[in-house]
Swiss-Prot record:
GO biological process: dUMP biosynthetic process; dUTP catabolic process
Function: This enzyme is involved in nucleotide metabolism: it produces dUMP, the immediate precursor of thymidine nucleotides and it decreases the intracellular concentration of dUTP so that uracil cannot be incorporated into DNA.
Keyword Iron-sulfur on entry: no
The name this protein goes by in its record: Deoxyuridine 5'-triphosphate nucleotidohydrolase
Family label: Belongs to the dUTPase family.
Keywords: Hydrolase, Magnesium, Metal-binding, Nucleotide metabolism
UniProt source species: Hydrogenobaculum sp. (strain Y04AAS1)
Originating gene: dut
Top-level EC class as recorded in UniProt: hydrolase
Reaction(s) the record says it catalyses: dUTP + H2O = dUMP + diphosphate + H(+)
Involved pathway(s): Pyrimidine metabolism; dUMP biosynthesis; dUMP from dCTP (dUTP route): step 2/2
EC number: 3.6.1.23
Length: 144
């Protein structure tokens, strides 16, 4: 499958797989410098737009190295890019550390995973089938 990528800025970097076994395509900051203060969130530009085939979405996910080394992660993870969106891909980053973080142009800021989407038919129901769990959630099955 091919992913069409349009550079919206000449200096934008095309996403790529860092290794042959990588699931996600690395996305890059196109801005000269982005400063993120502690607990601040910012919208970071990639300078690219994509065209996904119908039946697929792109999920924007954090990079583990950025989270571990700088305390920065993708806020709405995973972010969803629908197949009919043609605007610039931007990434919402949040600095969870107690120090100011600088993201430089060309730095990898997130990864993009292309996944199939299943469409369902929504049917209103008066009752749902019983299960052992029922409405238990938020740790109801135990912590250990």
């Amino acid at each position: 499958m091919k992913l069409l990528v349009k550079k919206l800025r000449e200096d934008a970097a095309l996403p790529f797989y860092a290794t042959s076994g990588a699931s996600g395509l690395d996305l890059f900051c196109v801005d000269d410098v982005v400063v993120i203060r502690p607990f601040e969130r910012v919208l970071v530009s990639t300078g690219i737009a994509i065209e996904l085939p119908e039946g697929y979405e792109a999920q924007i996910r954090p990079r583990s190295g950025l989270a571990l080394k700088k305390g920065v992660t993708v806020l709405n993870s995973p972010g969803t890019i629908d197949h009919d969106y043609r605007g610039e891909i931007k990434v919402i980053l949040i600095n969870l550390s107690d120090k100011e973080v600088i993201i430089e142009k060309g730095e990898r800021i997130a990864q993009m995973v292309i996944v199939p989407v299943l469409k369902v038919e929504v049917v209103e129901a008066k009752e749902l089938s019983n299960t052992q769990r029922q409405d238990g959630g938020f740790g109801s099955t135990g912590m250990k």
